[in-house]
Curated annotation (Swiss-Prot):
It catalyses: ATP + H2O + 4 H(+)(in) = ADP + phosphate + 5 H(+)(out). Produces ATP from ADP in the presence of a proton gradient across the membrane. The V-type alpha chain is a catalytic subunit. GO terms for cellular component: proton-transporting ATP synthase complex. ATP binds at G231, P232, F233, G234, S235, G236, K237, T238. This is V-type ATP synthase alpha chain. The gene is atpA. Its EC number is 7.1.2.2. PANTHER family: H(+)-TRANSPORTING TWO-SECTOR ATPASE, V-TYPE PROTON ATPASE CATALYTIC SUBUNIT A.
């Protein structure tokens, strides 16, 4: 460390530290602050004065203590050993921190992000003399039931002069050498604020299926898309995200708990290892990475945690996998931006947030997408961000900025949550811009008439919502029979189609063929009942028909028995209403 790269603490304001004498320092350099060598990052430079955000508690830090720059940006180490891991916001493994310092994170602690002693069974897929580019696949390593592909760093490439034979290696061992003398290891570093390069971005065409009927049918997300889940406190943002993490069809899940309650991360840690992965039969944690940055951890690390999470997601995307990133919650991240901005005495914008809030959010969400990697693989990162507007006010800056950026908007409703309606997503206040993109996929893979059925369901729900307003004013007796049928069908759609039981092993997640069958059954009931009304049958006789109970039980029928059950109910609908008509 040269003298020019060493400065002294000039002033301290919470996580913001001003250091003078920082000659040769660069923007976003990582620095070590004070005698305890706290981790910090330079976020502004004026001459030789650096403004540093410190990722640890600055209590006890004094003016005049040394500040040393490492000359390197905030980076994460990418390689085998990340799956089944839980990290803090700057990729320090919490289990190793606990071994070193107990239940609370000691200041200035330095631990390795990856296990440096564990040996991995490496099988090369290249040989000496081959030419490799950035993010090329050098070989594979088995990690649980997952094939971990070993990549060259995105900014390295050339002709290989030596490749290690198949065998067991640690992440520090050299497994290949380039012509320019660069040694390649099982792991490499990458700065979190720099998006990993790709060959091209692809038009999304595959759906990201969540197992939730309301999302997969009415408001779908594409593989590589972005979605926002805004909602007031207690409306189920975290539960919805955890459910998507469990049942979504992504290969890898990165879950970032950004400024949320510690108990929520504890729930994930306790629950995920016990959950069986439907793809592999093993624990769900074996394809999950958790980044825990709870509300009592230093505020500056929140700002880094979402970048850490998306960089890990991009690394697995570059291996040709589909990755889902859950950010819970981006509002806490924005609050961290606001606090640091105010400490630096920057000019505030709306509600005290910095003027660059929208740009920061856009830079984060734009790192999602379906891509062709530099190695020619197809990969995708889908980002689902929770937003926690204070008091449920959807007009506040974070929600509005997110609304402009994301392609799907899943609005949570506190009223539905209070009525124990899960998932508590408001079907009249949500939307998805990906619906027309996925129509062709649904026609080919689910049913030729799927888009039309979905539109009919959406129309019925809207009609029911407007009729409910009339009912609340004058009561149901003022409605005509046709309108009462719309209300009854809307109730069935709400309670027996959109609502799911998260504790029921069958109903917690639903496949698209089952969703399609349920849609056809519900609409068949409506069509047959409407025809019966025209033939003079009373609405009370229709509503009391026992077939309605069979329709309500359909969602609890296991997948293996569902098609036979659906056929029997459809036949019964035919005979029941024909009998009534006669």
């Amino acid at each position: 460390m040269t003298q020019q790269q060493r400065g002294v603490v000039q002033s301290i304001a919470g996580p913001a530290v001003i250091a003078s004498g920082m000659y040769g320092a660069k923007m976003y350099d990582i620095v070590r602050v004070g005698k305890e060598r706290l981790v910090g990052e330079i976020i502004r430079l004026e001459g030789n004065t650096a403004f540093v955000q410190v990722y640890e508690d600055t209590s006890g830090l004094t003016v005049g203590e040394p500040v040393e720059t490492t000359g390197l940006p905030l980076s994460v180490e990418l390689g085998p050993g990340m799956l089944n891991g839980i990290y803090d916001g700057i990729q320090r493994p919490l289990d190793k921190i606990r071994e070193a310092s107990g239940d609370f994170i000691a200041r200035g602690i330095e631990v390795s992000s990856l296990d440096r002693t564990k040996k991995w069974a490496f099988t090369p897929t290249v040989q000496a003399g081959d030419t490799v580019g950035g993010s090329s696949i050098l070989g594979t390593v088995p990690e649980f039931s997952f094939t971990h592909k070993i990549l060259t760093p995105p900014d390295k490439g050339g002709r290989l002069t030596w490749v290690a034979p198949a065998g067991e290696y640690t992440i520090d061992d050299t497994i290949a050498t380039l012509e320019d003398g660069t040694n390649l290891r099982l792991a490499h570093y990458w700065p979190v604020r720099a998006p990993r390069p790709v060959a091209q971005k692809l038009d999304p065409s595959q759906p990201f299926l969540t197992g939730m009927r309301i999302l997969d049918v009415l408001f779908p997300l594409v593989m590589g898309g972005t979605a926002a889940i805004p909602g007031p406190f207690g409306s189920g943002k975290t539960v919805t995200q955890q459910s998507v993490a469990k049942y979504g069809n992504a290969d890898i899940v990165v879950y970032v708990g950004c400024g949320e309650r510690g108990n929520e991360m504890t729930d994930v840690l306790v629950e995920f290892p016990e959950l069986e992965d439907p793809k592999t039969g093993g624990p769900l944690m074996h394809r999950t990475i958790l980044i825990a940055n709870t509300s009592n951890m230093p505020v500056a690390a929140r700002e880094a945690s979402v970048y850490t999470g998306i960089t890990l997601a991009e690394y697995f995307r570059d291996q040709g996998y589909s990755v889902s990133l859950m950010a819970d919650s981006t509002s806490r991240w924005a609050e961290a931006l606001r606090e640091i901005s105010s400490r630096l005495e920057e000019m505030p914008a709306e509600e005290g947030y910095p003027p660059y809030l929208g740009a920061k959010l856009a830079a984060f969400y734009e790192r999602a997408g379906a891509v062709k990697t530099l190695a020619g693989e197809d990969g995708a990162v889908s980002v689902i961000g929770a937003v926690s507007p204070a008091g449920g006010d959807m007009s506040e800056p974070v929600t509005q900025a997110t609304l402009r950026i994301t392609g799907a908007f899943w609005r949570l409703d506190a009223g539905l949550a209070r009525r124990r309606h899960f998932p508590a997503i408001n079907w009249n206040g949500s939307y998805s811009l990906f619906t027309p993109i996925l129509d062709s996929w649904y026609r080919e893979n689910v049913g030729r008439d799927f888009p039309e059925l979905r539109q009919r369901i959406s129309n019925l729900l809207q009609q029911e919502a407007s009729l409910q307003e009339v009912v609340q004013l004058v009561g149901p007796d003022a409605l005509q029979d046709q309108e009462r049928l719309v209300i009854e069908t809307g109730r069935m759609l709400r309670q027996d189609f959109l609502q799911q039981n998260g504790f029921d092993p069958v109903d917690a997640s639903a496949s698209m063929p089952k969703n399609y069958g349920l849609m056809k059954m519900m609409l068949k009931f409506y069509d047959e009942a409407e025809a019966a009304l025209r033939n003079g049958v009373g609405i009370d006789e229709i509503i009391q028909n026992p077939v309605i109970e069979k329709l309500s039980r359909a969602r609890y029928v296991p997948e293996a028995d569902f098609m036979a059950y659906a056929e029997s109910v459809m036949d019964e609908l035919d005979t029941t209403f024909k009998g009534v008509k006669a």
